[in-house]
Curated annotation (Swiss-Prot):
This is UPF0298 protein SUB0431. The keyword Cytoplasm applies. Belongs to the UPF0298 family. HAMAP family: UPF0298.
């Protein structure tokens, strides 16, 4: 049966927008900001390190950053009254 894969967001900063098509083979591109020259894409979590290394080796990629969505607190109720850690 089908098993759900854990996905992670990845932000890829480019030097030029014309190179955005070349990144499509590394994962599922969700958003392309032409003004900011970056792509938001999703890759499988078990392939994250490998994909980041491959992307950072490319000449047209300025930087590849993994999303910190899993690391932040998702309990928004009462954030103002909670003590800072």
């Amino acid at each position: 049966m089908f098993e759900k894969q854990k996905r992670v967001g990845l932000v890829v900063y480019l030097y030029y927008n014309r190179d955005a098509r070349k990144v499509h083979k590394y994962g599922d591109v969700y958003y392309h900001s032409k003004k900011g020259r970056y792509l938001v894409m999703y890759v499988n979590q078990n392939d994250l390190e490998e994909k980041m290394k491959e992307l950072q080796k490319l000449k047209f990629v300025k930087e590849a950053v993994a999303s910190a969505f899993d690391e932040i607190d998702h309990q928004f109720v009462g954030n103002l009254h909670r003590e800072a850690n």
